[in-house]
Amino acid sequence: MDIKLTESEVRVLGALIEKDITTPEYYPLSLNALVNACNQKSNRDPVMQLDEDAVRDALGGLQEQRMAGPARGADSRVTKYEQRLQEVFNFTRPEIAVLCVLLLRGPQTPGELRGRTERLHHFETLDDVQSALQKLMQRDPPLAKLLPRQPGTKESRYAHLFAGDVVEPEMPVHAATGVERNPKDAERIARLEEEVAELRREVVEVKDQLERFRRQFE
């Protein structure tokens, strides 16, 4: 099975998994609730601003790959949506918990995963987290990978492969050696970080538009 989701599809899928486990009383989700789940500021990296059209398009792409779709048997006049990963992959709860955090927050260390999966699944030890990661990496095709450890860091991170392979950029030397920043530069750096975040959101939108255009010819 060839998996290559857009960033919007990754976010929608992660949000559906999260709400399925943490707030089952409000699940499946209406389109409006799903938009809010995708755009919430907590437990999301990066924070995104998807509108209803973008989420609807992402749902269409996920439905084509049998990963999500309208809820079956829902007794409501409002269409609600659910994730269907169990039907495709038959994940264990530890696997789905780890995958959910990777989808919503990007690459993570085992320690970060243990802390951030607490509402999804309680891992007794880091070895339990590693076991879930190994199972994801041993799937065919692999659904996660171990990233090279960056200079100046103690732990390696793991990433999901639902959006294709992941290649981490080289870390600048000053970041690895811990050179102190000039306090006078803090405001300028904050502005630059805001601009980078905005550019990332624009790139996501453009990539999704290109992906939707490409799919018209498949």
Residue ranges and their predicted role:
Residues 1-10, 22-25, 43, 54-57:
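Eukaryotic, polar/proline-rich low-complexity intrinsically disordered regions
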Residues 6-25, 90-107, 133, 138-139:
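Positively charged, polyanion-binding regions of nucleic-acid-associated proteins
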Residues 15, 58, 132, 161:
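Residues in the recognition helix of alpha-helical DNA-binding motifs
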Residues 23-49, 107-123:
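Short acidic, hydrophobic short linear motifs in intrinsically disordered regions
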Residues 56-59, 63-73, 133-150:
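A short, conserved structural fragment
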Residues 74-112, 156-187, 191:
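Short, amphipathic alpha-helical interaction segments positioned at domain boundaries
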Residues 116-121, 147-162, 204-218:
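Helical coiled-coil/dimerization "stalks"
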Residues 179-216:
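Amphipathic alpha-helical oligomerization/assembly segments
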